Design a protein with these regions (language model features):
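Conserved glycine-rich cofactor-binding loop
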Residues: 14-15
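Conserved glycine-rich Rossmann-like NAD(P)H-binding loop of the short-chain dehydrogenase/reductase
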Residues: 30-44
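Rossmann-fold cofactor-recognition segment
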Residues: 49-67
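Hydrophobic positions on the long internal alpha-helix
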Residues: 72, 87, 120-124
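Catalytic Tyr-X3-Lys loop
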Residues: 92, 99-118, 161
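Amphipathic alpha-helical dimer-interface segment in Rossmann-like NAD(P)H-dependent oxidoreductases
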Residues: 112-130
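Catalytic loop of short-chain dehydrogenase/reductase
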Residues: 129, 135-160, 166, 173, ...
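C-terminal helical subdomain
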Residues: 166, 174-222
């Protein structure tokens, strides 16, 4: 289970979209480096992928803690070389009215949903720029376009991740690095137009497309 390609790093790995994207990149020959906070669940996920003959390794880290996330990315680089692909999928769902949201919880959610993405991009982009290739992907959401007062942190987080992705696309496209986000404008569920496998194909389309800010966002409507 070895590959000449650099790893595809999935940050915020779990069932659903991130697993479907991971498996899609594995089919293209990328070994997987998975980052998640829950070490026990991560170990189980890696074993499931190994059972499918997919090369994968797990690295436990908190995406909302810059030092923790940076250490995990450094460990991946040391063990598997520079990443060729990254998907940032970490986010927290904390429902409740806007005015019931505390500044502390809002800040914590933003660190996971957006600041961690910046930390990851800063850690991974230099090697991609040096190589003149690479892909940075971000899981977006319809709340970026249609914010809900019952999901204030996630609405702001998805607006932030969308803005970050589009700005990075403008900055990195001239250097050969492809950046994109899939804004998932619906509820993800198996066997529906919003099935994870269908969404994964949208991420692959960005990866295989040109490094162009004009095509950096796919609004996935099923």
């Amino acid at each position: 289970m070895t590959s000449p390609k650099g790893p595809a790093i999935i940050i915020g790995y779990g069932p659903g979209v991130s697993r479907a994207v991971a498996e899609a990149f594995a089919r293209e020959g990328y070994p997987l480096a998975l980052i998640a906070r829950n070490a026990a669940k991560l170990d189980a996920a890696v074993k499931e992928l190994h059972a499918e003959d997919i090369a994968a390794a797990g690295f436990s880290a908190d995406a909302g803690d810059a030092a923790s996330l940076t250490l995990a990315i450094d460990a991946i680089r040391a063990a598997h070389g520079d990443a060729e692909v990254m998907l940032y999928n970490a986010a927290l769902w904390r429902p409740g009215p806007v005015l019931d949201t505390t500044p502390e919880s809002f800040d914590a959610d933003f660190r996971v949903g957006v600041t961690g993405a910046l930390v990851a991009a800063r850690a991974l982009a230099p090697a991609m720029i040096a190589a003149g290739r690479g892909t940075l992907l971000f899981t977006g959401g319809g709340l970026a376009l249609y914010p809900s007062p019952q999901a204030p942190s996630l609405s702001v987080g998805k607006a932030g991740i969308r803005a970050l992705a589009l700005m990075l696309a403008q900055e990195l496209a001239p250097r050969g690095v492809c950046v994109g986000t899939v804004t998932i404008a619906g509820e993800v569920a198996p066997g529906t137009p919003f099935a994870p496998e269908k969404i994964a194909q949208a991420f692959l389309a960005i990866h295989h497309g040109p490094a162009d800010p004009a095509t950096a966002e796919i609004v996935f409507t099923g």
